Amino acid sequence: MTDAVGSIDMPDAQDEAPDSKKSRKGGKRGKKGPLKRLALFYRQIVADVRKVVWPSRNQLTTYTTVVIIFVVIMIGLVTLIDYGFSHAAKYVFG
């Protein structure tokens, strides 16, 4: 194999292990009951929500104002483009 930048390392034939020596995927993780998996999922959600950095009230007001102004500008832009296309269509098709 060449070690060029961006090349993919492909396994050679002698690198592959026979099927009898491969370990099973899943292991003990697949043996948990549905309630334990649901509890684990819930604990992971709570842990992730605790990591969230919530904006302050001032930041939230600023972000909301910026989004509303941007949406109003985009509505105006689309309205102008639509108005232009409608007049162009009336001019072309009579």
UniProtKB/Swiss-Prot annotation:
Q: How does it sit in the membrane?
A: Single-pass membrane protein
One Gene Ontology biological process: protein secretion
Segments of this protein annotated with the region Disordered: 1-32
Q: Which residues cross the membrane?
A: 65-85
User: Under the GO molecular function aspect, what terms does this record hold?
Assistant: protein transmembrane transporter activity
- Residue ranges, compositional bias (Basic residues): 22-32
- Stored Gene3D superfamilies: Preprotein translocase secy subunit
Q: Which UniProt keywords apply?
A: Cell membrane, Membrane, Protein transport, Translocation, Transmembrane, Transmembrane helix, Transport
PROSITE patterns membership: SECE_SEC61G (PS01067)
Q: What InterPro entries does the record point to? A: SecE_bac, SecE_sf, Translocase_SecE/Sec61-g
As for subcellular location, the record says:
Cell membrane
Show the GO cellular component annotation of the record.
plasma membrane
**Pfam families of this UniProt entry?**
SecE
| Subunit note | Component of the Sec protein translocase complex. Heterotrimer consisting of SecY, SecE and SecG subunits. The heterotrimers can form oligomers, although 1 heterotrimer is thought to be able to translocate proteins. Interacts with the ribosome. Interacts with SecDF, and other proteins may be involved. Interacts with SecA.
User: Which PANTHER family does this UniProt record tie to the protein?
Assistant: PROTEIN TRANSLOCASE SUBUNIT SECE
Q: Which family does it belong to?
A: Belongs to the SecE/SEC61-gamma family.
Q: What does this protein do?
A: Essential subunit of the Sec protein translocation channel SecYEG. Clamps together the 2 halves of SecY. May contact the channel plug during translocation.
Name of the protein in its database record: Protein translocase subunit SecE
